[in-house]
């Protein structure tokens, strides 16, 4: 890949062997199939602004909006996919930087749909940087890998010691109400995250790898009885992490629970990880919002607005 070097390196991932056939319609990474987005936020005259915006379709951000009534100084940027989802051969790069003392919220306009594939795969590389005293909420909507799809995502995160990042992914195991074979019917879902300090010290790395036919999916304490999962990172100073963990109540009921969730500490005193599973997306989203509300209150001293009506 000439547009973005690290994106080309993803093709060497072990799990992609057997998925490198070129699509018949348009070759992988052709013009129109490489989306790029760069967002830079900084503090200017006491206000956080989107000072750097670069986009290449099918990824699009138009401008920063200030619609969060609880944090009117928070620039909000919904990422729009003009292609209506991710197709075979698509390659995306997303770079987000929050400067010193600035804050931002980045989300998506709706679910991230990964369409059915008969050749190749789709890949995404993300760089997320939060500088000293910065605060970023990067919470994309749920990812839905369709039957037969192959998707690989790599996220590299750099967070200063006194900054806070709330980032994570929610995944629905296919279009569960569309077809009996949709549930975990995708060929490949590979998502890895690496967290470092500005000096390069690695704090944490995790990889989720689900391949078609993996029997562990049906195990108890994995996904038996559930169709949605979420992993949400809260990278924050140790004192703040301790207060958040103390306030968050583990949700675990032995009586046919709609959702199960809990918080654990990240290695190297880097922060916290929320893990949640649920029956439907709204069950898991409720757990994410419960965690999100506590994080915002402890870090910024601001409440989380009620769920928008369009949700």
Curated annotation (Swiss-Prot):
Signal sequence region: none
Organism expressing this protein natively: Methylorubrum populi (strain ATCC BAA-705 / NCIMB 13946 / BJ001)
InterPro entries, A to Z: UreD
UniProt gene name: ureD3
Primary localisation category: cytoplasm
Family of this protein: Belongs to the UreD family.
Record protein name field: Urease accessory protein UreD 3
A GO molecular function held by the record: nickel cation binding
Function of the molecule: Required for maturation of urease via the functional incorporation of the urease nickel metallocenter.
One Pfam family it belongs to: UreD
Domain of life: Bacteria
Assembly and oligomerization: UreD, UreF and UreG form a complex that acts as a GTP-hydrolysis-dependent molecular chaperone, activating the urease apoprotein by helping to assemble the nickel containing metallocenter of UreC. The UreE protein probably delivers the nickel.
GO cellular component: cytoplasm
Compartments where located: Cytoplasm
UniProt key word Metal-binding: no
Keywords recorded for this protein, A-Z: Chaperone, Cytoplasm, Nickel insertion
């Amino acid at each position: 890949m000439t547009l973005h070097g690290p994106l080309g390196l993803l093709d060497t991932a072990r799990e992609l062997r057997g998925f490198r056939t070129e699509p018949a319609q348009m070759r992988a990474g052709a013009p129109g199939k490489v989306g790029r987005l760069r967002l830079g936020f900084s503090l200017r005259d006491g206000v956080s602004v989107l000072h750097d915006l670069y986009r290449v379709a099918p990824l699009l951000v138009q401008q920063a909006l200030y619609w969060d009534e609880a944090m009117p100084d928070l620039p909000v940027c919904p990422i729009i996919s003009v292609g209506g989802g991710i197709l075979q051969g698509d390659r995306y790069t997303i770079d987000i930087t929050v400067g010193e003392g600035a804050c931002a919220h980045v989300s998506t306009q709706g679910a991230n749909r990964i369409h059915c594939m008969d050749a190749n795969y789709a890949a995404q590389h993300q760089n997320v940087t939060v500088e000293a005293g910065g605060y970023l909420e990067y919470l994309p909507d749920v990812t839905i890998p369709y039957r037969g799809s192959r998707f690989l995502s790599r996220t590299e995160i750099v967070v200063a010691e006194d900054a806070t990042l709330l980032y994570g992914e929610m995944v629905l195991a296919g279009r569960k109400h569309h077809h009996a074979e949709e549930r975990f019917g995708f060929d490949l879902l590979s998502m890895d995250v690496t967290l470092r300090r500005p000096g390069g010290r690695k704090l944490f790395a995790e990889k989720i790898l689900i391949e078609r036919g993996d029997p562990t999916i049906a195990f108890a304490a994995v996904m038996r009885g559930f169709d949605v999962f979420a992993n949400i990172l809260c990278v924050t100073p140790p004192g703040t992490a301790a207060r958040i963990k103390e306030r968050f109540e583990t949700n675990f009921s032995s009586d046919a629970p709609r959702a199960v969730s809990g918080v654990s500490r990240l290695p190297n005193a880097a922060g916290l990880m929320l893990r949640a599973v649920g029956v439907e997306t709204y069950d898991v989203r409720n757990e994410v919002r419960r965690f999100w509300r506590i994080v915002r209150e402890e870090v910024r001293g601001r409440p989380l607005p009620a769920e928008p009506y369009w949700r």
